[in-house]
């Protein structure tokens, strides 16, 4: 593989010295970019875009042509894993993801296969390999998966949910069934992420979008336990260097210590978490990623720069910070404002690395 020209992101994940704070944005390849919308229209729909390695590569690279980002992230979707288990993923306009088949009982869970990532998810590996070749070592490539708990919520609910009543009904009435599902998903995610690493991903991230809807006790039992299982099962070295892993639980700021105990390299923070407090609590053990409110990108440029300075000052001097949004960028944000954010991170962070 080509030697990496900019390894700032990987170094920061391992709390090694960098010249400026690295930055990337969750959903940086997305609907806020007109060129993304044109490529998606060319593909026909979102799923077709994910399954076409050349077009998935194109949209992965689009934000890097506009902004001096320090990492690329694979263009895909967290729901590729349940789709590969036979649930039939599709998207309703204005409704988000849906499954043709939901998981409703113990027998459904027992029937679920553990997908072979080189077969049922081979299109993802093709995309990873295509992106790595096209990056030519400019920046590292991040692979990712959803967490078992988050994937299970979509599988049991049949799609997006506001109240999570169906999965919580299973959790409280038949916890053994839910544990069986979560264990199958953890095994599937280990295989999936390790295949991404073999295909060329240089870091991986686990998105636990819905862990924050649980109580602390239930979070440890039904979400964190299975992310820990994944971290333990991951290939942590490739191409002669460590492959860092980041955990991100939206709404998980109260559980940072327990998350750091998994042995991950970094924690993603949402915007409700104070980064100075997070560093005091776990900064000696893990790097921190985040954590500007994505809605701040609607603000005038001066306000965006002010917020970047506040976050950088909150983390303070030294290593182990990757600047990012606290969740995905909104589709109607002006691309110019995303550029202001990225440029401000690099320019304003210089004094923190002397």
Curated annotation (Swiss-Prot):
Superkingdom of origin: Bacteria
Keyword Lyase: yes
GO CC entries: cytosol
Binding site for substrate: 27-31, 77, 154, 209, 327
GO biological process, alphabetically ordered: protoporphyrinogen IX biosynthetic process from glutamate
EC number: 4.1.1.37
Site (Transition state stabilizer): 77
Listed Pfam families: URO-D (PF01208)
Catalysed conversion reaction: uroporphyrinogen III + 4 H(+) = coproporphyrinogen III + 4 CO2
Coiled coil: none
Cleavable signal peptide: none
GO molecular function: uroporphyrinogen decarboxylase activity
Major subcellular site: cytoplasm
Pathway(s) served: Porphyrin-containing compound metabolism; protoporphyrin-IX biosynthesis; coproporphyrinogen-III from 5-aminolevulinate: step 4/4
Keyword line: Cytoplasm, Decarboxylase, Lyase, Porphyrin biosynthesis
Compartment list: Cytoplasm
Function (record text): Catalyzes the decarboxylation of four acetate groups of uroporphyrinogen-III to yield coproporphyrinogen-III.
Assembly: Homodimer.
Family note: Belongs to the uroporphyrinogen decarboxylase family.
Protein's UniProt name: Uroporphyrinogen decarboxylase
UniProt organism field: Edwardsiella ictaluri (strain 93-146)
Encoding gene, per UniProt annotation: hemE
């Amino acid at each position: 593989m080509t030697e990496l020209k900019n390894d700032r992101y990987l170094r920061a994940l391992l709390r090694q010295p960098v010249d400026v704070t690295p930055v990337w944005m969750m959903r940086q390849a997305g609907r806020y970019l007109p060129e993304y919308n044109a490529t998606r229209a060319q593909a026909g729909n979102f799923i077709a875009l994910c399954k076409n390695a050349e077009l998935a590569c194109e949209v992965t690279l689009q934000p890097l042509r506009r902004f001096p980002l320090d990492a690329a992230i694979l263009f895909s979707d967290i729901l590729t894993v349940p789709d590969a288990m036979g649930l039939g993923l599709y998207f309703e306009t204005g409704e988000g993801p849906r499954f043709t088949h939901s998981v409703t009982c113990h027998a459904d869970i027992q029937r679920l296969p553990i997908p072979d990532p080189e077969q049922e998810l081979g299109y993802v590996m093709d995309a990873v390999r295509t992106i790595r070749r096209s990056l030519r070592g400019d920046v590292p490539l991040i692979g990712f998966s959803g967490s078992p708990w988050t994937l299970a919520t979509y599988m049991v609910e049949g799609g997006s949910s506001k109240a999570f009543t169906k999965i919580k009904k299973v959790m409280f009435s038949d916890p053994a069934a839910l544990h069986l599902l979560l264990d199958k998903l953890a095994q599937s995610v280990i295989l999936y992420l390790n295949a991404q690493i073999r295909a060329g991903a240089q870091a991986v991230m686990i998105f636990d979008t819905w862990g924050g809807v649980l109580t602390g006790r239930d979070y440890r039992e039904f979400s964190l336990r299975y992310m820990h299982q994944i971290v333990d099962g991951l290939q942590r070295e490739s191409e002669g260097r460590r492959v860092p892993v980041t955990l991100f639980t939206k709404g998980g700021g109260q559980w940072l210590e327990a998350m750091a105990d998994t042995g991950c390299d970094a924690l993603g923070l949402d915007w409700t978490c104070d980064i100075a407090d997070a560093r005091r609590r776990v900064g000696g053990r893990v790097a921190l990623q985040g954590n500007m409110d994505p809605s701040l990108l609607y603000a005038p440029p001066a306000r965006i720069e002010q917020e970047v300075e506040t976050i950088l000052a909150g983390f303070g001097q030294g290593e182990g910070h990757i600047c990012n949004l606290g969740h995905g960028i909104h589709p109607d944000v002006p691309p110019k404002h995303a550029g202001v954010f990225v440029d401000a991170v690099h320019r304003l962070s210089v004094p923190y690395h002397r």
